[in-house]
Curated annotation (Swiss-Prot):
Job of this protein: Quinone reductase that provides resistance to thiol-specific stress caused by electrophilic quinones.
Phylogenetic lineage: Bacteria, Pseudomonadati, Pseudomonadota, Gammaproteobacteria, Alteromonadales
Record protein name field: FMN-dependent NADH:quinone oxidoreductase
Cofactors named for this entry: FMN
Organism: Shewanella baltica (strain OS155 / ATCC BAA-1091)
Family named by the database record: Belongs to the azoreductase type 1 family.
Cofactor note: Binds 1 FMN per subunit.
């Protein structure tokens, strides 16, 4: 049985197009027997903003404040959740040409030297290996493979840095460029999702 972690990151609630696609993917994969865990980073599972105190605490140490200990424990939970699943599905709507703050927060909690990556004499090495990632990205305009897409290249870089290099991408583009373009973008994305195996 494939174990899947789904990360939602939209802050738009019922208006979220990425949530529609993620729910479609979850339903499709559940019929294939996948065990799915959902973390709604833009909703009920929103994470604290990583500030200087938290960032310092995530490096560990003997003299951590109560808040730092709590945030380190949260980070450990998120990392364990990441490592426990075979496939990581990331909903990545484009907000102002990049990913939502809520998703960046998750990255800041799990990207830890000595835990999810390490530095060697030949450069960095990811420690989260043998995983697959699926990015589901929605955007109001058309940005795929262009200089204004700072979503997919960034996420591929981060995932590769921690060891996840098997990355598939589902695009839903031009969603704000009129009803016809919206329907076409969503239809093509749903079709792409239906071709994916859990």
């Amino acid at each position: 049985m494939s174990k899947v972690l789904i990360l939602k990151s939209s802050i738009l609630g019922g208006y979220s197009q990425s949530a529609v696609l993620i729910d479609h993917l979850a339903s499709h994969w559940e019929t294939q027997g996948a065990a799915i865990t959902v973390r709604d980073l833009g909703g009920k599972d929103v994470l604290p903003m990583v500030d200087g105190e938290i960032a310092s605490g995530l490096r560990g140490g003997a003299e951590l404040s109560a808040r730092q200990q709590e945030m380190l424990a949260l980070s450990d939970t998120l990392v364990a959740e990441l490592k426990a699943n075979d496939t990581i599905v990331i909903a990545a709507p484009m907000y102002n040409f990049t990913i939502p703050t809520q998703l960046k927060n998750w990255i800041d909690f799990i990207a830890r030297a000595g835990v999810t990556f390490t530095y060697t004499e030949t450069g960095p090495k990811g420690l989260v290996e043998g995983k697959r990632a699926v990015l589901v990205t929605t955007r109001g305009g058309a940005h795929k493979d262009g200089p204004t897409d700072h979503v997919v290249p960034y996420l591929k870089t981060v995932l590769g840095f921690i060891g996840i290099t098997n990355v598939e991408v589902v695009y839903a583009e031009a969603l704000n460029m009129g009803p016809e373009a919206h329907d076409k973008g969503m239809s093509e994305a749903k079709h792409s999702i239906e071709q994916l195996k859990a």
